[in-house]
Amino acid sequence: NDRQYTGMPTTPEIEYGFGPSFRYKKFDFSFFFQGAARVSIMMNGIHPFGAEGTRNVLQFIADDYWSETNQNIYAEYPRLSKRDNENNTKASTYWQRNGAFLKLKNLEVGFNHKFFRVYLRGSNLLTFSPFKYWDPEMGSGSGLSYPTQRVFNVGVQFSINK
């Protein structure tokens, strides 16, 4: 029996967040960072190589794989096929990646006046991670799910004082 545990679990062992708020004269500023550590992402080796006519191959895989016509021994990915390949679909540390990340989840800047406040808010603005294939917050799999959307809002809040 030569099996052993590798990497970290696919559920983060550490999740964290922090975010201060500041006011200076008529301006306010707040942000929130969220992150995860001690987590692995298992890229699904089956999905890109699935059944004929049912799936597409991610571009980064299609650009760098071994084939008989392109026998690049330094290719990043194993051979492609329209059918299941036993050598490509077995669980392997080849598909395991570090899934740690730090995200700037929210940032808001506002200007306060006596009767109103104007603000600009952004969500999911930046991601810092060694994992570059898809949003690491999506976790393991194929990366073909919808990622967290980046959102920008501009708003005005009015106050009526008696």
Where are these regions (language model features)?
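Transmembrane beta-barrel domains of outer membrane proteins
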Residues: 19-23, 32, 110-112, 145, ...
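Residues that define the transmembrane beta-barrel architecture of outer-membrane proteins
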Residues: 12-16, 96, 100-105, 148-152
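Repeated loop/turn-to-beta-strand initiation elements of outer-membrane beta-barrel proteins
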Residues: 26-29, 115-116
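C-terminal beta-signal and terminal closure region of outer-membrane beta-barrel proteins
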Residues: 65-72, 76, 89, 127-162
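Transmembrane beta-strands of outer-membrane beta-barrel pores
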Residues: 24-26, 35-39, 106, 122-129, ...
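Extracytoplasmic gating/loop element in the C-terminal half of outer-membrane beta-barrel translocons
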Residues: 36-117, 122
